[in-house]
């Protein structure tokens, strides 16, 4: 980030998966004291209820567009881009309501607390020989399993047999539950995973 700033290079953060509270802060980039010039967000902005995405620009970029427009450059020529998930009243209304609920119910603070709780619980089983590493932030955690066959063909179906829908990306079992997950549900997830791994 420092090198980009020094050389006047715009920084872009892809926060489609990590933004809107998923990592325990509003934007994941906040965890790293990183202030991007452009931010792409989606998914959680509507809590998954409606396909919505947005591209956010800092004031410096907007000011430069305004200056170009004052010099006779039409806005449509300055800012040419497309996005298939923007411009709907329904999406905007849902997103505003989601942001209101996140703030009203302190859900991002809860994600941070639940994420720490989940990480502590998962770290208790990390010594299992089938686990290479557990990493993540907030409620975006990856459990790196010793091999992808075990992750996809054994752990994933077994977890589903216990009522837990999981996704394996290669060797990594993803733990990215609803922000409303309870500590009891986290315990059930970890205990079920541990039992499957120790069979």
Explain the meaning of each model-derived region.
Residues 1-199:
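Conserved N-terminal phosphate-binding loop of PLP-dependent enzymes in the Aspartate aminotransferase
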